Curated annotation (Swiss-Prot):
Record field: transmembrane: 31-51, 94-114, 136-156
Species assigned in the record: Saccharomyces cerevisiae (strain ATCC 204508 / S288c) (Baker's yeast)
Protein name from the UniProt record: Putative uncharacterized membrane protein YEL018C-A
Keyword Membrane: yes
GO cellular component terms, semicolon-separated: membrane
Origin organism lineage: Eukaryota, Fungi, Dikarya, Ascomycota, Saccharomycotina
Protein's membrane topology: Multi-pass membrane protein
Extra facts: Partially overlaps EAF5.
Length: 177
């Protein structure tokens, strides 16, 4: 299966109300459902949450959790987050997006990349910038030619912890299948 892959490096504030770029919806406080009790944690979260709050987790807990609130634009996705004690290890997020959202996603890929550069250069928060980007949605109406025959967007987000305690450095791979 052929596809187009876009790689983005983004600095994501750990804000529980930060709207997701792909789905355009906000996230309620996570509700975690523990299943096991071992020395690491795996968490499933809705794509509306591109953040993690370490205070939710105990040092020796393993849990699989999910946010039940659906995205307003019906963007099915899940995230797998691996913790070891209190240390954040990695997160992989997989999203499937309906094809009619591709015009938004394509330009948001570029906007997220630019915003990440601004954040890294000037150490500013993305919360206000996120609101500005969301107001640009009405002008994102023209799909790129290479997306016209596509039906799904596959996003794989891999996050690693950075030096600050309130943000995550993430690597997003967008595959248009």
């Amino acid at each position: 299966m052929c596809g187009v892959v876009v790689v983005i490096v983004a600095l994501v504030p750990a804000d529980p109300l930060l709207p997701a770029f792909a789905c355009g919806c906000s996230c309620d406080a996570p509700v975690f459902i523990p299943f096991f009790n071992i020395s690491s944690s795996i968490i499933l979260i809705c794509s509306t949450c591109v953040f993690l709050n370490r205070s939710y987790f105990s040092s020796r807990s393993f849990s699989i959790s999910c946010i039940s609130k659906p995205c307003r634009l019906s963007c099915p996705s899940f995230s797998v987050v691996l913790y070891s004690g209190n240390k954040f290890l990695t997160m992989v997020r997989i999203s499937l997006m309906p094809s009619f959202l591709f015009p938004f996603a394509t330009l948001l890929c570029l906007l997220k990349f630019v915003s990440s550069l601004i954040s890294k250069l000037f150490c500013i928060s993305l919360v206000n910038l996120t609101s500005d980007i969301r107001r640009l949605f009405p002008i994102m109406l023209i799909p790129p030619p290479f997306l016209t025959s596509s039906s799904f967007l596959l996003e794989i987000k891999v996050c690693i912890s950075c030096n600050t305690t309130n943000s995550l450095t993430s690597l997003s791979i967008y595959a248009f299948l």
